[in-house]
Amino acid sequence: MKIKYFFFIISSLLLSNDLNQDQLNKIKKITDDIDLAKDFTLSSVKEDSLYTLSIMKDKVILINFWATWCGPCRMEIPDFNDLYKKYNSKGLNILGVSISDTKEQLEKFLKVYEINYPVLYGNQKVIDKMVTDYGGVYSIPTTFLIGKNNKIKRIYPSAILKQYDPNMYSDLVYNIEILLSE
């Protein structure tokens, strides 16, 4: 709905060159939140605490939608651990959001796979709503890079693997560094 409204506004803008500053400000206000990451609150497996996106608005956030049964998701973990180790103290938070696993399944998984960043879960209705709010996650893994003030800066709709796709990995690192410097 917002996208259609956005295009309507842009079309109107292009057809009319007589907009004053007040009208331009109204258009900007209406369209500002189109690329905002939707707020959520999910539980952390390891810390047994809650994570809310809006509380982290002064951080750069990498949200990785994944599942324990997903092979490429498992392959990303070491690279994300490295990114977390390198950039967490500089303001990057990585959140692994499980799209289908229970807390018990995740605890069992974490006994085998070392994940240094927070792994989040929620009941399936909450997760499904989050996936919908983020425009639908059509494949996993899917990763969202979110800048300060919760603006979505980049979406990676596949595995980000340093070894197998160094260009995508370099793009991610480049964008993280830019966002951290803002």
Task: Name every feature range the model reports, one short phrase each.
Residues 4-13:
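Sec-dependent N-terminal signal peptides
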